[in-house]
């Protein structure tokens, strides 16, 4: 135990990160996050793949993986020749044997092959050949040093006394919340926040608002956040071909676009705008630019024809969709909007019908609102059960730089 703990004390002051096959469509982003130091206890580390799959990694494998990632990162970009890989593996084994001197290098290489195989399988949605443990974030929380995601509200709802969004969504959870109307930080100030997030070992940041594309420096901020898994939440209105190209060049990992309905009138009514066509074009432009796209739909009585919306999105080339109930905050907490919420039975049926369509048509659907649909019903549909991660797996930074438990 002494050697392991000495290694942890010296080497696990920050997470390690690398990308396998960075120029390939099947690239795998890995953030290995060590736990809080525990002198007399073995605690697993956490590997986060592409910002969403969380895998517990036992102590010895975490040490092996740490050394392998550090050696990989000395190589740089480009195709790796065989002799370079051999040198990386040789150095990895030599460093790990300082902690485990009695372990045969061949055993270390076999373990490393197993680890990388599991990560490849999980990242690509395949069943791993070995059983991996389950990670309950609530149980693991006491060993975490920081949340796994920080939502950066880079754009406020009001600016200089004027509305600062290109839509007026009737269910907007940010509208009317005091912190959403704070003054915005400048470019350099947000870059400092990114540095602090990295130092705190937070692997993922989401650029949100308000409407983050209202900022002229958004692509610059995303580019400055390349070390993280980066996501963008937007209404899609400003996603022109040129803008999407700039997002791709900034190496944005994922864009979530809010789309209420394939019915033009319903979508425009719920967004309080006349931008249905621009939003559809934004989805198409993001896909054409090679961005990873998911389309989110907050469900209510007006747009419960969700299956038709999924069919429409399928025709655009969208393969991943998410849906939710109405978040009871901001505008959505007003009496008129509360009356538009679907009952548990109604939203369950809407989701069930759409899940069946998606399963038959090569689409993936996730439901993201905890407590709206019973766990048994979600499992019966083959969906993951959502949970609230506020102040646990995620937190948020307001437009003025304050840290809050959740942006909604």
Language-model-detected regions and their locations in the chain:
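Eukaryotic partner-binding/assembly regions in large regulatory complexes
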Residues: 1-31
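Radical SAM enzyme [4Fe-4S]-AdoMet core and its adjacent flexible, acidic
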Residues: 7, 260, 265-404, 408
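Accessory C-terminal segments flanking Radical SAM cores
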Residues: 25-67, 82, 369-408
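Short amphipathic alpha-helical interface segments
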Residues: 54-102
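Conserved alpha-helical substructure of the radical SAM core
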Residues: 100, 107-115, 122-123, 128-250, ...
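Flexible, glycine- and charge-enriched loops at secondary-structure boundaries
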Residues: 105, 162, 179-190, 269-276, ...
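Alpha-helical scaffold elements within enzyme catalytic domains, especially in hydrolases
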Residues: 118, 171, 196, 224, ...
């Amino acid at each position: 135990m002494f050697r392991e703990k000495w290694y942890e004390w010296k080497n696990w002051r920050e997470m390690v990160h690398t990308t396998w096959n960075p120029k390939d469509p099947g690239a795998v982003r890995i953030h290995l996050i060590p736990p809080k130091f525990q002198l007399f206890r073995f605690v697993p580390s956490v590997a986060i793949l592409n910002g969403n799959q969380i895998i517990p990694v036992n102590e010895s494998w975490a040490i092996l993986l740490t050394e392998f990632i550090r050696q990989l990162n000395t190589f740089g970009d480009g195709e790796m020749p065989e002799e370079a890989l051999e040198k990386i593996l040789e150095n990895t084994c030599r460093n790990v044997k300082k902690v485990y001197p009695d372990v045969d290098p061949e055993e270390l290489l076999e373990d490393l092959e197993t680890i990388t195989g599991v990560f490849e399988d999980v990242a690509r949605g395949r069943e791993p050949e070995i059983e991996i443990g389950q990670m309950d974030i609530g149980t693991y929380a006491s060993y975490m040093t920081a949340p796994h995601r920080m939502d950066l509200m880079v754009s406020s709802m009001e600016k200089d006394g004027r509305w600062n969004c290109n839509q007026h969504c009737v269910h907007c959870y940010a509208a009317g919340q005091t912190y959403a109307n704070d003054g915005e930080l400048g470019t350099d100030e947000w870059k400092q926040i990114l540095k602090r997030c990295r130092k705190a070992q937070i692997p993922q940041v989401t650029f949100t608002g308000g409407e983050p594309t209202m900022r002229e420096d958004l692509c610059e901020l995303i580019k400055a956040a390349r070390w993280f898994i980066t996501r963008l939440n937007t209404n899609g209105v400003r996603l022109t071909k040129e803008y999407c190209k700039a997002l791709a060049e900034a190496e944005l990992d994922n864009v979530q676009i809010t789309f209420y309905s394939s019915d033009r009138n319903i979508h425009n009514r719920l967004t309080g705008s006349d931008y249905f066509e621009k939003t559809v074009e934004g989805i198409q432009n993001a896909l054409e630019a090679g961005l990873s796209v998911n389309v989110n739909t907050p469900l209510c009585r007006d747009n419960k024809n969700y299956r038709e919306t999924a069919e429409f999105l399928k025709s655009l080339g969208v393969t991943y969709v998410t849906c939710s109930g109405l978040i009871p905050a901001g505008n959505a907490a007003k009496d008129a909007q509360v009356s538009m919420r679907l009952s548990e039975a109604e939203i369950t049926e809407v989701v069930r019908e759409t899940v069946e369509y998606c399963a038959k048509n090569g689409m993936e659907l996730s439901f993201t609102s905890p407590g709206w649909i019973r766990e048994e019903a979600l499992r019966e549909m083959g969906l993951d059960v959502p949970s609230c991660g506020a102040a646990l797996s995620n937190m948020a930074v307001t437009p003025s730089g304050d840290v809050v438990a959740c942006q909604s």
